[in-house]
Amino acid sequence: MTALDTDTPTAGRSAPLISPGPVIPPPDFGPLDRAQGWAMTAIITALAAITRFLNLGSPTDAGTPIFDEKHYAPQAWQVLHNDGVEDNPGYGLVVHPPVGKQLIAIGEWLFGYNGLGWRFSGAVCGVIIVMLVTRIARRISRSTLVGAIAGLLIIADGVSFVSSRTALLDVFLVMFAVAAFACLMVDRDQVRERMYHAFLDGRIAETRWGPRLGVRWWRFGAGVLLGLACATKWSGLYFVLFFGVMTLVFDAIARKQYHVPHPWRGMLRRDLGPAAYVFGLIPFAVYLASYAPWFASETAVNRYEVGRSIGPDSILPIPDALRSLWHYTHAAYRFHSNLTNADGNHHPWESKPWTWPMSLRPVLYAIDNQDVPGCGAQSCVKAVMLVGTPAMWFIAVPVLGWALWRTVVRRDWRYGAVLVGYMAGFLPWFADIDRQMYFFYATVMAPFLVLAIALILGDILYKPNQNPERRTLGLLTVCFYVALVITNFAWMYPILTGLPISQTTWNLQIWLPSWR
């Protein structure tokens, strides 16, 4: 043996293995087929516009609004002709923030005080919701085909359809909540892209908390949109809370995936403060800004309560205008909190939240069965009912169960995000089940149900390691289901739009005893 052999540390041993670098997520920050994606989105949006605007001005109640349109259409008209505030002469109090009525007023300004006028803005928002759901599904599934499927499903959803064609506030709440969700999905991808580049630059472990992520404009946009949601209905606050927690969890997981030494503490140190600003201060500022006409008015409801219902002195140096707004807000809250069954408040179409996932107790917005012509039978019926398309809503429980399993067991963030959105519109209502409630509160749940179904269909289409026969079977299954939903929607179309049908057909449309 030579000296060289004995002096070599690796003599007589195999070559050492090189330790691999830490495993990080692949650089996947969104779909890449942008041209195809936008072409598909344009087609789906055009289809949505046709369905939402076709014969939009009908039906009416002898030329007047139907159901709760009787509140919001007149209030929007007052907004239009009273410097942006409601006179509200026919009711004791205006009990919802102003943004929804301000948007309804745009349509009334364009087309006048008629069915088209007071429903126009809602229909525009309904089309935007379809576009947003399409884009969200495409982004989180990384599939333009799945995005198209989601778009078709939301077009054919009875709840989303009817809410887009009536002058209630819920469609505006849905649009702002879904738009905020869309912003947060883009923000999630952007955060991971920034973390990826920080990893390549060696900046991940510069501190125990990981890198700062810079200005996050998509998340800022989500804060603005959530403020508009709260300024439409106070239930928008639930989405502020649920989405705020969701994005912080996303941040912590991203830091963990890119091997930040202390990811959760890093999230608390780096991300919690900016998130509090985006989900706290920004929505509050937007909410206050929506009351600008009220602040500027001399005659708005409760505008000058300091010195009347409120004492002139205050412990904190709060401007009188804000104190008056707080008094007004508290009066509206008192109205809602006292609207309970125990106090004798009942409505023939009220429902409780456990009936909402399967659309077990819909809402009849309008019905006319007296001397109605046009159906070819002796007895005709015209009705508008807010009801979910059964092919989707009747399977809500297994869909949600599957989504929960995918979230908890398979750690599939896509299903988790969709569940957060769904539960934000569902769970908080269980806090006071004695309150008078209606199925139209569940309108905001519909887009997230559609997203969950679209993800499941996408998993059927793109299940890995499938042989050609199983892939073909999966494609046929998805096509059959989408066709079933569209057929179901077409069958129910008359009771969603107020078209005249025979009494026999009406009885066939009402599937469940609880629908009567």
Swiss-Prot record:
InterPro entries: GlyclTrfase_39-like, Glyco_trans_39/83, PMT_4TMC. Pfam families: PMT, PMT_4TMC. Disruption phenotype: Loss of DNA conjugation when disrupted in recipient strain, strain does not secrete EsxB. One of its GO terms (cellular component) is plasma membrane. It is a multi-pass membrane protein. Its EC number is 2.4.1.-. The keyword Transmembrane helix applies. It is an enzyme of class 2 (transferase). Residues 1-23 are annotated as: Disordered. It is found in: Cell membrane. PANTHER family: DOLICHYL-PHOSPHATE-MANNOSE--PROTEIN MANNOSYLTRANSFERASE, PROTEIN O-MANNOSYL-TRANSFERASE 2. DNA conjugation in M.smegmatis is unidirectional with distinct donor and recipient strains; mc(2)155 is a donor strain while MKD8 is a recipient strain. Mutations in a donor strain that alter DNA transfer do not always alter DNA transfer in a recipient strain. Belongs to the glycosyltransferase 39 family. This is Polyprenol-phosphate-mannose--protein mannosyltransferase.
